[in-house]
Design a protein with these regions (language model features):
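A donor-sugar binding/catalytic signature common to diverse glycosyltransferases
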Residues: 121-165
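C-terminal amphipathic helix plus adjacent low-complexity
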Residues: 196-256
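Thr-Gly-centered strand-to-loop micro-motif
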Residues: 60-61, 91, 135-136, 155-158, ...
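Short, conserved active-site loop motifs that form the nucleotide-linked donor/cofactor pocket
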Residues: 28, 113-115, 177
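Donor-nucleotide binding loops and adjacent catalytic segments primarily
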Residues: 8, 12, 18-19, 33-132
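Nucleotide-sugar donor-binding patch of glycosyltransferase catalytic domains
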Residues: 151-207
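Membrane-proximal helix-turn-helix segments that form the acceptor-binding/catalytic region
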Residues: 1-3
Protein backbone atom coordinates (compact mmCIF):
# COMPACT_ATOMS: atom_id res chain seq x y z
CA UNK A 1 0.00 0.00 0.00
CA UNK A 2 1.03 3.60 -0.61
CA UNK A 3 -0.24 7.02 0.46
CA UNK A 4 -0.48 9.65 -2.26
CA UNK A 5 -1.18 13.22 -1.15
CA UNK A 6 -2.42 15.48 -3.93
CA UNK A 7 -0.48 18.57 -2.93
CA UNK A 8 2.91 19.75 -1.68
CA UNK A 9 4.16 19.57 1.92
CA UNK A 10 5.36 23.18 1.82
CA UNK A 11 1.78 24.26 1.07
CA UNK A 12 -0.19 21.84 3.24
CA UNK A 13 1.11 18.87 5.20
CA UNK A 14 -1.78 16.82 6.60
CA UNK A 15 0.67 14.52 8.40
CA UNK A 16 2.33 17.31 10.35
CA UNK A 17 2.12 16.74 14.09
CA UNK A 18 1.15 13.09 13.72
CA UNK A 19 3.41 10.57 15.43
CA UNK A 20 3.55 8.15 12.52
CA UNK A 21 6.01 5.28 12.23
CA UNK A 22 8.80 5.59 9.69
CA UNK A 23 7.24 2.88 7.55
CA UNK A 24 4.26 5.15 6.90
CA UNK A 25 6.46 8.10 5.97
CA UNK A 26 8.37 5.94 3.49
CA UNK A 27 5.11 4.98 1.78
CA UNK A 28 3.97 8.60 1.41
CA UNK A 29 4.36 10.61 -1.80
CA UNK A 30 3.33 14.22 -2.45
CA UNK A 31 2.23 14.58 -6.06
CA UNK A 32 1.66 18.32 -6.41
CA UNK A 33 -1.72 19.84 -7.27
CA UNK A 34 -3.82 18.60 -10.17
CA UNK A 35 -3.67 20.89 -13.19
CA UNK A 36 -7.06 21.76 -14.67
CA UNK A 37 -7.95 22.79 -18.21
CA UNK A 38 -10.95 24.35 -19.89
CA UNK A 39 -12.93 21.51 -21.45
CA UNK A 40 -13.22 21.31 -25.21
CA UNK A 41 -16.08 23.48 -26.36
CA UNK A 42 -16.37 25.23 -22.98
CA UNK A 43 -14.46 28.41 -23.85
CA UNK A 44 -16.73 31.42 -23.40
CA UNK A 45 -17.41 33.89 -26.20
CA UNK A 46 -17.73 37.55 -25.23
CA UNK A 47 -21.48 37.30 -25.82
CA UNK A 48 -21.67 34.44 -23.32
CA UNK A 49 -19.66 36.15 -20.60
CA UNK A 50 -21.54 37.67 -17.65
CA UNK A 51 -20.68 41.25 -18.68
CA UNK A 52 -19.77 40.84 -22.35
CA UNK A 53 -16.21 41.98 -22.99
CA UNK A 54 -16.03 43.74 -19.60
CA UNK A 55 -13.78 42.16 -16.93
CA UNK A 56 -15.44 40.65 -13.89
CA UNK A 57 -14.63 39.14 -10.50
CA UNK A 58 -15.76 35.54 -10.07
CA UNK A 59 -17.24 34.74 -6.64
CA UNK A 60 -17.59 31.02 -5.99
CA UNK A 61 -17.85 28.67 -3.02
CA UNK A 62 -17.51 25.48 -5.06
CA UNK A 63 -20.47 23.32 -4.09
CA UNK A 64 -21.73 26.28 -2.07
CA UNK A 65 -23.06 24.39 0.94
CA UNK A 66 -21.46 26.71 3.50
CA UNK A 67 -20.79 29.76 1.33
CA UNK A 68 -23.40 32.04 2.93
CA UNK A 69 -20.98 34.18 4.93
CA UNK A 70 -18.60 34.77 2.02
CA UNK A 71 -21.40 35.58 -0.43
CA UNK A 72 -23.01 38.00 2.02
CA UNK A 73 -19.71 39.73 2.76
CA UNK A 74 -18.90 40.32 -0.91
CA UNK A 75 -22.46 41.37 -1.68
CA UNK A 76 -22.51 43.89 1.17
CA UNK A 77 -19.32 45.40 -0.25
CA UNK A 78 -21.05 45.98 -3.59
CA UNK A 79 -24.23 47.24 -1.94
CA UNK A 80 -22.34 49.82 0.11
CA UNK A 81 -19.67 50.75 -2.43
CA UNK A 82 -21.46 51.44 -5.69
CA UNK A 83 -18.22 52.69 -7.27
CA UNK A 84 -16.56 49.27 -7.27
CA UNK A 85 -14.60 49.37 -10.56
CA UNK A 86 -15.01 45.70 -11.56
CA UNK A 87 -18.42 43.97 -11.50
CA UNK A 88 -18.95 40.63 -9.78
CA UNK A 89 -20.39 37.36 -10.98
CA UNK A 90 -21.67 35.02 -8.26
CA UNK A 91 -21.90 31.27 -8.79
CA UNK A 92 -23.76 29.93 -5.76
CA UNK A 93 -23.21 26.22 -6.29
CA UNK A 94 -25.75 23.38 -6.24
CA UNK A 95 -25.68 22.86 -2.46
CA UNK A 96 -26.41 26.37 -1.19
CA UNK A 97 -29.80 26.46 0.53
CA UNK A 98 -32.45 27.45 -2.07
CA UNK A 99 -33.95 30.05 0.29
CA UNK A 100 -30.54 31.71 0.59
CA UNK A 101 -30.14 31.64 -3.18
CA UNK A 102 -33.48 33.43 -3.52
CA UNK A 103 -32.53 36.03 -0.91
CA UNK A 104 -29.17 36.73 -2.53
CA UNK A 105 -30.72 36.86 -6.01
CA UNK A 106 -33.25 39.46 -4.84
CA UNK A 107 -30.46 41.66 -3.48
CA UNK A 108 -28.40 41.22 -6.63
CA UNK A 109 -31.38 42.22 -8.80
CA UNK A 110 -31.15 45.70 -7.26
CA UNK A 111 -27.53 46.14 -8.37
CA UNK A 112 -26.29 47.02 -11.84
CA UNK A 113 -22.79 45.62 -11.40
CA UNK A 114 -23.53 42.17 -9.96
CA UNK A 115 -24.94 39.10 -11.73
CA UNK A 116 -25.42 35.54 -10.53
CA UNK A 117 -26.12 31.97 -11.53
CA UNK A 118 -26.91 28.98 -9.36
CA UNK A 119 -24.46 26.70 -11.14
CA UNK A 120 -22.60 26.31 -14.42
CA UNK A 121 -21.47 23.01 -15.90
CA UNK A 122 -18.23 24.62 -17.08
CA UNK A 123 -16.97 26.72 -14.15
CA UNK A 124 -13.40 26.36 -15.43
CA UNK A 125 -14.14 28.67 -18.37
CA UNK A 126 -15.68 31.30 -16.10
CA UNK A 127 -12.72 31.19 -13.72
CA UNK A 128 -10.14 31.28 -16.50
CA UNK A 129 -11.76 34.42 -17.99
CA UNK A 130 -12.14 36.25 -14.66
CA UNK A 131 -10.07 39.29 -13.68
CA UNK A 132 -9.92 37.82 -10.18
CA UNK A 133 -11.50 35.12 -8.05
CA UNK A 134 -13.03 35.25 -4.57
CA UNK A 135 -13.37 31.75 -3.12
CA UNK A 136 -13.34 29.76 0.10
CA UNK A 137 -10.27 27.78 -0.86
CA UNK A 138 -11.53 24.23 -1.25
CA UNK A 139 -9.15 21.87 -3.00
CA UNK A 140 -10.82 21.87 -6.42
CA UNK A 141 -11.16 25.65 -6.59
CA UNK A 142 -7.54 26.12 -5.52
CA UNK A 143 -6.46 23.81 -8.35
CA UNK A 144 -8.46 25.95 -10.79
CA UNK A 145 -7.03 29.21 -9.45
CA UNK A 146 -3.48 27.91 -9.79
CA UNK A 147 -4.08 26.27 -13.18
CA UNK A 148 -5.65 29.36 -14.76
CA UNK A 149 -3.25 31.71 -12.95
CA UNK A 150 -5.91 34.02 -11.54
CA UNK A 151 -5.42 36.62 -8.79
CA UNK A 152 -7.33 35.20 -5.84
CA UNK A 153 -8.82 36.33 -2.56
CA UNK A 154 -9.51 33.38 -0.28
CA UNK A 155 -12.16 33.59 2.47
CA UNK A 156 -11.71 30.24 4.23
CA UNK A 157 -14.03 28.55 6.67
CA UNK A 158 -12.57 28.09 10.14
CA UNK A 159 -15.30 25.82 11.55
CA UNK A 160 -15.80 22.92 11.90
CA UNK A 161 -12.57 22.14 9.99
CA UNK A 162 -9.40 24.17 9.49
CA UNK A 163 -8.34 22.60 6.18
CA UNK A 164 -9.18 25.66 4.07
CA UNK A 165 -7.71 28.09 6.58
CA UNK A 166 -4.42 26.21 6.91
CA UNK A 167 -4.02 25.89 3.13
CA UNK A 168 -4.92 29.53 2.48
CA UNK A 169 -2.66 30.80 5.28
CA UNK A 170 0.35 29.02 3.86
CA UNK A 171 -0.46 30.05 0.29
CA UNK A 172 -0.69 33.67 1.43
CA UNK A 173 2.70 33.38 3.16
CA UNK A 174 4.12 32.06 -0.12
CA UNK A 175 2.59 34.94 -2.08
CA UNK A 176 0.23 32.78 -4.14
CA UNK A 177 -3.04 34.33 -2.90
CA UNK A 178 -4.46 36.89 -0.47
CA UNK A 179 -6.66 35.81 2.43
CA UNK A 180 -9.39 37.44 4.51
CA UNK A 181 -10.71 35.72 7.63
CA UNK A 182 -14.26 36.85 8.49
CA UNK A 183 -13.75 36.52 12.24
CA UNK A 184 -10.76 38.86 12.09
CA UNK A 185 -12.74 41.53 10.22
CA UNK A 186 -15.75 41.68 12.56
CA UNK A 187 -16.55 45.16 13.86
CA UNK A 188 -18.18 46.30 17.10
CA UNK A 189 -20.73 43.99 18.65
CA UNK A 190 -21.75 42.66 15.25
CA UNK A 191 -20.44 39.27 14.23
CA UNK A 192 -20.55 40.37 10.59
CA UNK A 193 -17.21 41.16 8.95
CA UNK A 194 -16.67 44.78 7.92
CA UNK A 195 -17.83 45.40 4.34
CA UNK A 196 -15.16 48.10 3.95
CA UNK A 197 -12.41 45.52 4.43
CA UNK A 198 -13.87 43.43 1.63
CA UNK A 199 -14.48 46.45 -0.60
CA UNK A 200 -10.82 47.46 -0.34
CA UNK A 201 -9.64 43.93 -1.11
CA UNK A 202 -11.95 43.74 -4.14
CA UNK A 203 -10.57 46.99 -5.54
CA UNK A 204 -7.03 45.64 -5.32
CA UNK A 205 -7.80 42.12 -6.52
CA UNK A 206 -7.47 42.56 -10.32
CA UNK A 207 -4.01 44.15 -9.87
CA UNK A 208 -2.85 41.49 -7.44
CA UNK A 209 0.14 39.32 -8.35
CA UNK A 210 -0.83 36.12 -10.13
CA UNK A 211 0.31 32.76 -8.69
CA UNK A 212 2.78 32.04 -11.50
CA UNK A 213 4.93 34.97 -10.34
CA UNK A 214 5.93 32.76 -7.41
CA UNK A 215 8.21 29.88 -8.37
CA UNK A 216 7.12 26.71 -6.57
CA UNK A 217 8.74 23.63 -8.13
CA UNK A 218 6.25 20.86 -8.84
CA UNK A 219 3.24 22.94 -7.82
CA UNK A 220 1.01 21.72 -10.67
CA UNK A 221 2.75 18.44 -11.50
CA UNK A 222 0.06 16.30 -9.88
CA UNK A 223 -1.23 14.49 -12.97
CA UNK A 224 2.24 13.75 -14.27
CA UNK A 225 3.39 12.42 -10.91
CA UNK A 226 0.26 10.33 -10.43
CA UNK A 227 0.86 8.73 -13.83
CA UNK A 228 4.46 8.06 -12.85
CA UNK A 229 3.44 6.50 -9.54
CA UNK A 230 0.84 4.35 -11.27
CA UNK A 231 3.47 3.07 -13.68
CA UNK A 232 5.83 2.26 -10.81
CA UNK A 233 3.08 0.45 -8.91
CA UNK A 234 2.06 -1.45 -12.04
CA UNK A 235 5.67 -2.47 -12.62
CA UNK A 236 5.93 -3.82 -9.11
CA UNK A 237 2.68 -5.70 -9.61
CA UNK A 238 3.91 -7.27 -12.82
CA UNK A 239 7.21 -8.25 -11.21
CA UNK A 240 5.39 -9.78 -8.25
CA UNK A 241 3.10 -11.80 -10.51
CA UNK A 242 6.08 -13.04 -12.51
CA UNK A 243 7.78 -14.27 -9.36
CA UNK A 244 4.81 -16.46 -8.50
CA UNK A 245 4.70 -17.84 -12.03
CA UNK A 246 1.85 -15.73 -13.43
CA UNK A 247 1.75 -13.51 -16.48
CA UNK A 248 0.08 -10.09 -16.55
CA UNK A 249 -3.34 -11.66 -17.14
CA UNK A 250 -3.07 -13.68 -13.98
CA UNK A 251 -2.96 -17.04 -15.81
CA UNK A 252 -0.67 -19.84 -14.61
CA UNK A 253 2.41 -20.36 -16.78
CA UNK A 254 4.10 -23.68 -17.31
CA UNK A 255 7.41 -24.62 -15.65
CA UNK A 256 9.53 -27.73 -16.10
Amino acid sequence: DEIWIYGLPQVSNPLEGLDLPGAIARKTSYTGYLRRAVRNGAATLDADKPFGDQPYIMVTAGGGGDGELMFDWVLRAYENDSAQPVPAFFMFGPFLDPDLVSQFAARIARLDNVESVTFDTHPEALISDAAGVVAMGGYNTVCEILSFDRPALIVPRTKPRLEQFLRASRMQEMGLVKMLVPEEAAVGESSLPDWKVMATALRHLPQQRVPSKVVVPGLLDGLRNVNRLVEIAAGRRRASMHLVGRDTTGQQTGHS
